[in-house]
UniProtKB/Swiss-Prot annotation:
Known EC number: 2.7.7.72, 3.1.3.-, 3.1.4.-
Catalytic reaction(s) noted: a tRNA precursor + 2 CTP + ATP = a tRNA with a 3' CCA end + 3 diphosphate; a tRNA with a 3' CCA end + 2 CTP + ATP = a tRNA with a 3' CCACCA end + 3 diphosphate
Record's subunit section: Monomer. Can also form homodimers and oligomers.
Protein name: Multifunctional CCA protein
Cofactor(s) required, per the database record: Mg(2+); Ni(2+)
Length: 409
């Protein structure tokens, strides 16, 4: 019975990165051997056990064979006669197919260390093409390690292209897809994730609404990058640079979907794209069963981001409607995330990355002015129901008129 540290823990140690999760593989053991030593079984598809003291996962060495469509269409075989090399060959990338024994000796049958040094993401074997989830995983690793100079090997990108064209991506469940997408969006360079999916043809299968943005022009005066797809990648990049949460990053990715529906005869203008894009945002949200907070912010940013950019020009009544749409009185954080997404949209333009965004503080001040209006004096007057609501709205409007008057240039 030999125990090896495998996968990400080995990869990240060699990269000089912090090691968070450690996976172990056990060679030459059976389920009975593990139980005798006090390991607790937790695996449903294949034998995985928790260490009796550390609770870390230990999996029996196994092989796998394609038996159906999708990432779940595999038959696994785990037994004491499965070798370490057989276990490692089923893994996705060479940099994830290395193992280390208790003395730190490296087992690297597929040249993972060489690819690590060359900064290449390369598949281990042709069996890579049997699992469509690996398209998303490789794109996610590309997003994680782009800052270290990693790129996807051309032959691996070609396999990803073949997988995308095969239709197998449609077999991925919403939950598994969203898990990979959400993790990728929180990497250091999430725009690389979208770019790689675009390059291998997977984006048109997974999110055709986003794919449709590439090649769609915008007015050069406002968007020197011109291409809407390139703009969205830049907005997403800015959201990562500024360390924004998943809600903001998801909204940044989807905010301009309406531009993909603009007739070519109307290019490069995109009148009412905020409204036309809402059904597309909703469709993407539903496709991946996106968490409610991400869904809500994406729809609100899609609908109102132009209001955000024109905040200083808005009439007090329009500003009040905007604040009401976000329920800033009970959900101030959601409005703050809206402001963040708008600012990233403004910065996600070539040459505008460092441009100030005075709209942000103006919107925060407007929200504060509206929130500080007290309902108590109105209650003391005996107002209630619709009468109370109308009076409170009127007081907030007065507060915003005063606020705007104090900010006239």
């Amino acid at each position: 019975m030999q125990i090896y540290k495998v996968g990400g823990a080995v990869r990240d140690r060699l990269l000089g990165q912090p090691v968070t999760d450690i996976d172990w593989v056990v060679v030459g053991a059976s389920t009975e051997d593990m139980l005798v030593k006090g390991y607790r079984p937790v695996g449903t598809d294949f034998p995985v056990f928790l260490h009796p003291l550390t609770n870390e996962e230990y999996a029996l060495a196994r092989t796998e064979r394609k038996s159906g469509v999708g990432y779940g269409g595999f038959v696994f075989h785990a037994s004491p006669d499965v070798t370490l090399e057989q276990d490692l060959i089923r893994r996705d990338l060479t940099i994830n197919a290395m193992a280390e024994d208790k003395d730190g000796n490296l087992t690297d049958p597929y040249n993972g260390q060489q690819d690590l040094e060359a900064r290449v993401l390369r598949h281990v074997s042709p069996a890579f093409a049997e699992d469509p989830l690996r398209v998303l995983r490789v794109a996610r690793f590309a997003a994680r390690y782009a800052g270290h100079g990693f790129t996807v090997a051309p032959e691996t990108l070609e396999l990803m292209r073949q997988l995308s064209e095969s239709g197998e991506l449609k077999a991925l469940t919403a939950e598994r897809s969203w898990k990979e997408i959400s993790r990728a969006l929180m990497e250091d360079q999430p725009q690389v994730f979208i770019q790689v999916l675009h390059d291998c043809g997977a984006l048109s299968e997974l999110m055709p609404e986003v794919e449709a943005l590439f090649g769609v022009p915008q007015p050069a005066a406002h968007h020197p990058e011109i291409d809407t797809g390139v703009h969205v990648l830049s907005v997403l990049e800015q959201s990562a640079i500024h360390k924004h949460p998943l809600t903001v990053r998801w909204a940044c990715l989807l905010h301009d979907l309406g531009k993909g529906l603009t007739p070519e005869s109307e290019w490069p203008r995109h009148i009412a794209h905020e409204h036309t894009g809402l059904r597309l945002i909703k469709a993407v949200n539903e496709r991946f069963r996106v968490p409610r907070d991400c869904q809500e912010l994406a729809l609100l940013v899609g609908q109102y981001h132009t209001h955000g950019h024109r905040a200083l020009e808005l009439k007090p009544s329009t500003l009040l409607e905007l604040l009401h749409s976000f329920d800033v009185y009970r959900r101030p954080q959601r409005f703050e995330e809206f402001i963040a997404a708008c600012e990233m949209d403004a910065r996600g333009r070539h040459g505008f990355e460092q441009r100030s965004y005075p709209q942000a503080d103006y919107l925060r001040g407007a929200a504060h002015a509206a929130r500080t209006v007290s309902v108590q004096p109105l209650l003391e007057k005996g107002l209630k129901g619709k009468e109370l609501g109308d009076a409170l709205k009127n007081e907030r409007l007065k507060a915003l008129k005063t606020y705007k008057a104090g900010h006239v240039a």
